[in-house]
C-alpha cells in the first residue's frame, strides 16, 4: 500500500509527491531529482498529479527512462494511478562555467567546435546534421562555418546565394543578422564571397574574422553554437583553436573515418587541442561502414574499429558511428540535411542519437 490509501487515510499533497520523486535518481549526473531542483510546478487536482521535470538539455537521451521512473515512484509510493500522472518536460541549459564567463559569446550557453585531423572525412556533414538534430530535440542552435578555405555550410543547408543583413546594436555598433534555415541560425564566409573566388587569408586575418562572427552576429539566445572548424593542424586551425579557447569554448568533437591514415591525423589534432587547453568532448566515426541497399550486406569500406581504438587510447567517449549512405551525401548536395529525411540510408536517427549523446556529455561536464 502507498503512503495514502484510496479511503483517504492520508490526503494527497505536494509534499508527498515531492517525497516520492526524491527517490528518482538523475541517471547521468547522480543525486535525486528533487535535491537537484529538477521538479517544478507540482499540481494536485483530486487524484490527479502533474509536474514538470526540468532537464539539463532538451536533447536528453534518457528522457523516457526518467519519465518511467517518475511515474513508478509516484504510483507506488503515493498510490496514484498511472493514468492520473501527467509529466511535462522543460530544460535549462546551464551556461559554460568557470573563468571564461566574462569572455563568453553573449546569449550563448555552449560553444562546441567540430574538428578533423584531415579533410575529406565528412566534418561539415557531421556539423550540419548535428546542429539540425539538436534543434529537432528542442534546443536553440547556431552554426558557424569557420572552415574559411572550404565554406560548405551555405550549400549543405540550402542557403547558397543569400547574404546576411546588419542592424545597429545597443552600443551603436553594427550587428549581423544570421541567415536561418532548418531552425538554425547560420554565419559563414561563404555568404560574403563568390563561389568561384579563392580565399587567400592567413591565420591572424581568419582569427579576426572569427571574432567578428562570434561577437558581432546576433546569435542570442542559443543553447549551442556549433563551429565547423577548418581541417588539419596548420596555422589557421591552431590560431582558431587558440582564439576559441579565449572565448570560453566548451569543447571540441573530433571527426574521423575508420582507417589508420585518418585516425593518425586525428591523434595529431587531439594533441593540438590539448596544447591549447581545450576540453575534448569525444570522437565521431563517420563513414563507419556501408550497407548495400539491394542486398543489405555490410561492407567496411574504410576498415573497421579505428575510432573505437583511438577513443580507448585517448580515454574519450566514442559519441557515435555514422554509416556511409547515399542519402547522407545527396542531402548535403541538395541543401536538405540527412537528419530531416526519412530515407533508410539517411540514418537520421543515428544523427539524433549522436546529438543526444553529445548534449548529455556537455551536461555531465557542467552539472557534475
PLM feature spans:
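Helical hairpin unit composed of two closely spaced alpha helices linked by a short loop
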Residues: 226, 245-285, 289-290
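Residue-level signature of catalytic and energy-coupling elements of molecular machines
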Residues: 21, 39, 60, 74, ...
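C-terminal lobe/tail of nucleotide-utilizing enzymes
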Residues: 2, 9, 14, 36, ...
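Extreme N-terminal, non-catalytic leader segments
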Residues: 35-38, 43-49, 56-115, 362, ...
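N-proximal, solvent-exposed amphipathic alpha-helical segments enriched in charged/polar residues
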Residues: 2-40
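Walker A/P-loop phosphate-binding motif and the immediately C-terminal alpha-helix
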Residues: 111-148, 270
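Phosphate-binding loop that captures ATP/GTP phosphates
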Residues: 134-196, 201, 207-211, 308
Amino acid at each position: 500500500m502507498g503512503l495514502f490509501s484510496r479511503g483517504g487515510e492520508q490526503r494527497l499533497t505536494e509534499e508527498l509527491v515531492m517525497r516520492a520523486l526524491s527517490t528518482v535518481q538523475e541517471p547521468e549526473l547522480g543525486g535525486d531529482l528533487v535535491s537537484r531542483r529538477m521538479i517544478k510546478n507540482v499540481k494536485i487536482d483530486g487524484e490527479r498529479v502533474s509536474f514538470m521535470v526540468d532537464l539539463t538539455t532538451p536533447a536528453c537521451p534518457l528522457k523516457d527512462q526518467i519519465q518511467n521512473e517518475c511515474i513508478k515512484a509516484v504510483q507506488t509510493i503515493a498510490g496514484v494511478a498511472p493514468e492520473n500522472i501527467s509529466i511535462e518536460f522543460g530544460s535549462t541549459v546551464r551556461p559554460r562555467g568557470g573563468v571564461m564567463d566574462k569572455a563568453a559569446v553573449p546569449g550563448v550557453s555552449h560553444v562546441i567546435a567540430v574538428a578533423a585531423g584531415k579533410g575529406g572525412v565528412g566534418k561539415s556533414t557531421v556539423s550540419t546534421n548535428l546542429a539540425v538534430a539538436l534543434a529537432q530535440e528542442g534546443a536553440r542552435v547556431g552554426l558557424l562555418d569557420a572552415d574559411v578555405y572550404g565554406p560548405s555550410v551555405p550549400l549543405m543547408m540550402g542557403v547558397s546565394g543569400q547574404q546576411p543583413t546588419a542592424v545597429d546594436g545597443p552600443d551603436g555598433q553594427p550587428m549581423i543578422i544570421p541567415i536561418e534555415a532548418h531552425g538554425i541560425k547560420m554565419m559563414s564566409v561563404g555568404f560574403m564571397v563568390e563561389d568561384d573566388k579563392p580565399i587567400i587569408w592567413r591565420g591572424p586575418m581568419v582569427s579576426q574574422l572569427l571574432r567578428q562572427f562570434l561577437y558581432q552576429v546576433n546569435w542570442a539566445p542559443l543553447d549551442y553554437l556549433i563551429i565547423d572548424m577548418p581541417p588539419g593542424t596548420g596555422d589557421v586551425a591552431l590560431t582558431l583553436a587558440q582564439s576559441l579557447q579565449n572565448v570560453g569554448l566548451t569543447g571540441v568533437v573530433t571527426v574521423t573515418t575508420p582507417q589508420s591514415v585518418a585516425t593518425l591525423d586525428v591523434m595529431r589534432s587531439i594533441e593540438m587541442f590539448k596544447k591549447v587547453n581545450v576540453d575534448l568532448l569525444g570522437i565521431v566515426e563517420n563513414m563507419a561502414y556501408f550497407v548495400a541497399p539491394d542486398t543489405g550486406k555490410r561492407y567496411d569500406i574504410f576498415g573497421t574499429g579505428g575510432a573505437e581504438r583511438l577513443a580507448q587510447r585517448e580515454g574519450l567517449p566514442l559519441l557515435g558511428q555514422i554509416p556511409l549512405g547515399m542519402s547522407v551525401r545527396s542531402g548535403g548536395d541538395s541543401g536538405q540535411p540527412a537528419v530531416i529525411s526519412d530515407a533508410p540510408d539517411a540514418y537520421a536517427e543515428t544523427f539524433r542519437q549522436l546529438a543526444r549523446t553529445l548534449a548529455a556529455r556537455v551536461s555531465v561536464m557542467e552539472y557534475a
